Amino acid sequence: MKFFVDSADVAAIAELNALGMVDGVTTNPSLILKSGRNILEVTREICDLVAGPVSAEVVAAKADDMIEEGRKLAEIAPNITVKVPLTWDGLKACKVLTDEGRMVNVTLCFSVNQALLAAKAGATFISPFIGRLDDINLDGLELIADIRQVYDNYDFQTEVLAASIRTPNHVAQCARIGADVITAPPAVIKGLANHVLTDKGLEMFDADWAKTGQTILSL
């Protein structure tokens, strides 16, 4: 399963990338706002840093305008993935852009039917939002499993990119289900290393080692 970083924080992306943890990056208008930077500037910097797909999102509502914005964003770097919303106009834009050979990430997916339409439109990635479904007492992970099954049933090549990842359990369950990709904030990815028993084990080892009176570097 590939790990994408859901962030426009170049320093945070670079830290994870140095460990080989970054297979791609996803951004959106909210993350660009949080970065406080120009979208073209920060996106270009991320593309220079990361070899994998970097999603940059259109903001237009109409298909023709989305297509023009998508083409403009795609000029930034060869690894740009144009992100479009899962609306009828977004699907129209997806079809045109993928026919032109561009990667497209169809975002804000909340149902199997939407995922089917995106795959039929040739989407490179479909982004179902787990956390936002959980917020309204629906099962976001169940949607990931359902899309995985449907795509496998019909051999769709669209990759399932699980988004709105908020917890380590979301990541573990997506891996079990067979999501192709998860995208998560840097803090969530770093948090995957944490476990209470690891902490307790280290405390015990540190206490026992202190009792030996030794230091490894002085041996």
UniProtKB/Swiss-Prot annotation:
Record keyword Mitochondrion present: no
Recorded superkingdom: Bacteria
Keyword annotations: Cytoplasm, Pentose shunt, Schiff base, Transferase
Pathway the protein contributes to: Carbohydrate degradation; pentose phosphate pathway; D-glyceraldehyde 3-phosphate and beta-D-fructose 6-phosphate from D-ribose 5-phosphate and D-xylulose 5-phosphate (non-oxidative stage): step 2/3
PROSITE patterns: TRANSALDOLASE_1 (PS01054), TRANSALDOLASE_2 (PS00958)
Pfam family, one: TAL_FSA
Main location: cytoplasm
E.C. no: 2.2.1.2
Disulfide partners: none
Any one GO biological process: pentose-phosphate shunt
InterPro entries xrefs: Aldolase_TIM (IPR013785), TAL/FSA (IPR001585), Transaldolase_3B (IPR022999), Transaldolase_3B/F6P_aldolase (IPR004731), Transaldolase_AS (IPR018225), TSA/FSA_arc/bac (IPR033919)
Annotated HAMAP family: Transaldolase_3b
Job of this protein: Transaldolase is important for the balance of metabolites in the pentose-phosphate pathway.
Protein name: Probable transaldolase
Organism for this UniProt entry: Cereibacter sphaeroides (strain ATCC 17025 / ATH 2.4.3) (Rhodobacter sphaeroides)
